[in-house]
C-alpha cells in the first residue's frame, strides 16, 4: 500500500509541475514551445509567509496573490478587485503557546510577535472585530483560486507554498487539491534556464551577462555558487526588493523578476545552454525529494 501511495504521489507531482524532471534539459526554444499550451491561462503569482517550515507545527501568517494574463510572457495584471488577494492572519492559540514555551528568549520578544501578523492601524480599520483566522483566509484563498479562469499557480520554490497551503487546508477539512492545477516553479526557471544562459553568455564575453553572473555569485560553506534566490536575481535586474518577505511585495517582486527572465530568454532563445543546464539537471536529480525555504 505504501508503494502504491508513493507511486500515486509521484504521478500527481509529475502531472502538476509544468517544468517537471522529464523537461529539465529542454532548450530555451523548447521551453517557449511548451509554454504556448498555457498562453491563454490565468497565471496566479502567489506567496505565503509562515511561522516556520513545517505545516504540521507552524501556521500561515500571510497569503498574497496577483492574477495575470501571460501577454507574450510580460504578464498583464487582471484589472479588477478579484485579480488580487492579500490578507494577514491572526496567530492561532497554539502558535502563541509555542512562542511562550520557546527556550529562545528572542521568540518571546514583542517585536517578534509583531513580525508574525500583529495588526497594523490599517488592519484594525479593516477588521474592527479583529484579524481573520487561518481557516477563514484559507477558505477565501481557495474561493479566489476557483474564481480564476484556467489557473496556473506560480511561485518561487513552489513546492513549499503548495505543500504548506495543502497541509493547512487539510487540517481544517477545506476541500482543495492544490496539485490539480498546473504549477510553474520560478526557481526551476532560474536554475535550469536563466542561470545556464547567463553562464553561457558570460563565457562568450557578454559583459551584461558577466555583470549579472557576478551579482548572483555567492560564497557558501562549500565554495562559490550561483544563487537562484528571488532577492539576488531581482536585484541583478534592478527590481525593487523593498519589503522582501511580505507576501504581496514578494508576489510583485516575483512578477517583475519573471518578466525580466523571460525577456532575457527570448533575446537569446537560440543559444545552446546544454553545458551548464545538463550539470544542473544532474544535480537536481541527485538530490533527494524535498525543498528548501532558503531558495525564497
Regions found by a protein language model. Name each.
Residues 168-172, 192, 196, 236, ...:
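Active-site catalytic microenvironments for nucleophilic, acid-base chemistry
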Residues 90-127, 186-252:
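Active-site-proximal helix-loop-helix substrate-binding element of RNase H-like nuclease domains
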Residues 1-40, 293-296:
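Charge-dense, intrinsically disordered terminal/linker segments
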Residues 23-166, 227-236:
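Conserved non-catalytic scaffold segment of RNase H-like nuclease domains
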Residues 53-55, 191, 256:
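Conserved protein kinase catalytic core
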Residues 160-184:
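Substrate-recognition/cap helix-loop segment adjacent to the acidic, metal-dependent catalytic center
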Residues 22-34, 206-222, 235-236, 248, ...:
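Acidic two-metal-ion nuclease catalytic site recognized across multiple nuclease folds
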Residues 7, 11, 27-34, 140, ...:
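Charge-rich, solvent-exposed alpha-helical interaction surfaces
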